[in-house]
Amino acid sequence: VIATSFTGCFGRKKSGEAFSMPIMDEPTSLDPQIADSNSEKLVAANCYEGLVRIMADGTIGKGVATDWNISDDGLTYTFKLRNNSHWAMFSGHKAVLGENYEDTFDITVKAEDFKFGIERTLSEQTGSADAPLFSAVKSISTPDDFTIVFNLSYADDNFLYALTNPGAMPCDEEFFNLTNGK
């Protein structure tokens, strides 16, 4: 909870100003789906934006999701995403994505990226510490680029809070595969 609180506290960044925060140990991975230590979770919370976030008062607020609906029985969660969220891309990506990656690689964060991220979290092969948080998830669908629907096998009052954890962060499948998951 502390890590996600820091992400919104510094809205008046001046040009050339850096934000630094001491962490207990050096993260061994920047992959949010396998973030395990407090340091890794702290880094993930400050590098990725989820569907929702925990606000200063402890309530759930908007992240990439602009709106969401929960069915009366608590088994279906539907999120609408904003269409102007983008992956940060740097010139170093040319080695992996090609010289003209800006023209060939879609940097828009889409519903499918959240679906793939949570599916990775749930995969035994990933071994994510966050997997138990999503045990209620029966299926995930993306009816369009900016809508994601979670169908749960049982009502989970903590599901929105689970979505604030690193295991729920987006992961672009094309980029993941091109980099062999690194």
Describe each PLM feature range.
Residues 1-19, 29-32, 59, 99-103, ...:
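Short, low-complexity disordered leader/linker segments with a strong preference
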Residues 15, 27-34, 59-61, 87-89, ...:
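Short, solvent-exposed loop/turn elements at domain surfaces
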Residues 66-126, 149:
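Aromatic- and charge-enriched surface segment that lines or borders ligand/interaction sites
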Residues 113-115, 120, 126-179:
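Surface-exposed binding/hinge segments that line
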Residues 9, 178-182:
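Short, intrinsically disordered, charge-balanced linker/junction segments flanking boundaries
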Residues 24-27, 35, 56-57, 73-74, ...:
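Solvent-exposed coil/turn segments that connect beta secondary-structure elements
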Residues 22-72:
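N-terminal lobe/hinge region of extracytoplasmic solute-binding protein
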Residues 16-18, 46, 63-65, 72-76, ...:
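Extracytoplasmic
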